[in-house]
Amino acid sequence: MTGEPSGANGHKTLVDVKGLVKHFPVRAGLLQRIRGWVQAVDHISFTIREGETLGLVGESGCGKTTAGRTMLRLVEPTSGSMLFEGVDVFALRGRELKAMRRNMQIVFQDPFSSLDPRMPIGESVSEGLEIHGVGNAKQRREVMLDSLRRVGLESYHAKRYPHEFSGGQRQRIGIARALALRPKFIIADEPVSALDVSIQSQVLNLLKDLQEEFHLTYLFIAHNLAVVEHISDRVAVMYLGKIVELASREELFLNPGHPYTQALMSAIPLPDPNLTRQRVILQGDVPSPLNPPSGCRFHPRCPIARLEHCSAEEPQLRELRPEHWVSCHYAEDLL
């Protein structure tokens, strides 16, 4: 997968994740010895091109949020590399890492807990500017007010506290905070999952407008396929710490090549009650990442699995069609 092509659009690669691994130790006993490892993210690789949005989708617990946080080193990786403009972020320390982080920001999932309740939102938005030593106090205030205006808030809102805002407004504040440093790359970690449907579209459209204006690159993490389809250029599907499919938005939604992706697609509600779609019902529950299945991690729930092969050999991401990567031994059977 590390040889993933750059694509026909000619845009250069901004982010290149290679073999990313994040395992969490499980400790037990009086001496808190390590008894096992939760394989939250297990050898995933992908690229994100300059100016595009890559959607990262999967069920809760599949590792998508951990992948995003590890990329920014909010949690330290177990192994792998993350190249940003050709520089390995995982190899940076001290001032070099701090300088790199100015170009990489995150919008958190929960707009209620991601803001300090004791801090006026103007201070929250300008805090990153102060940490990175951007300008003087007057210049930082101008950038802060401009960032608030960009997300649809007014200058008088800067003195108010988070509890005085609605959920949608708080998420806009989170976006303004990420935008203030004028980064090149933003990870949006389920930014609309805690919002009403009527507010979700407003926030999504805001993200798209800001991307066009500031030439931003997004990693958009979500579990809602309809949301991912609305905003993404390409989509990666995760299952139990692995990427099982990666393709353009149009290709993935028209021709899903992995049985897990097909099951997710079949669960999307149709807007017309007179239309029906054949549901793909998966058997059993998602296995534990503490003890994942051998071979293909999806094989215990897969409707086309051949036990002797799928349980013994782990499939690798391979190019099923141009720019369409699938991790399945029998993906051709679904064509």
Q: What is the predicted role of each segment?
A:
Residues V87-D88, K138-Y156, F185, Q262-S266:
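Conserved ABC ATPase "signature" region
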Residues G80-D88:
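Conserved ABC transporter NBD signature motif
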Residues L30-R35, V89-Q105, I131, A137-K138, ...:
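ABC ATPase NBD coupling module
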Residues Y161-F165, Q169:
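Conserved ABC ATPase signature
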Residues E4-T13, V26-Q32, W37, L246-L335:
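Short catalytic/signature loops enriched in Gly
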